[in-house]
């Protein structure tokens, strides 16, 4: 059984310029690949990931995809940190579905915490493993949410 990972994004810390376009593109079955910070070195090609939006509310899972390149070291996305030698682990993440948290339904973090209290939903770094007992239920919830296009109520 492959692992499922939780990658994170905080818009307050990184301006993801392609975000809106990618949200639209994935609805047209386009896939997009980005180098993503991942504190674990264990993700393998083919592993699934979910993307959780952090920072200011709303927070929650807004994306899904697969790892297409295993762990490698690359400069930090913050140029100043990279200049100081901060070169964290990365993976290449291929997004197959990305939601615009300002306009679309997504899996709210508070609901996730309530449904799956054993899982960490506010990681201090991107790239933690989703617990084996949580992953299948999370996938089902994600698929149901996508197909109904309705936000799970708070």
Predicted features by range, described:
Residues 60, 66-129:
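Aromatic- and Lys/Arg-enriched surface recognition patch
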Residues 1-45, 113-114, 130-132, 136-154:
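Compositionally biased, charged N-terminal/linker segments
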Residues 53-58:
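Short, charged beta-turn/beta-strand-edge "cap" motif at the junction between a beta-strand
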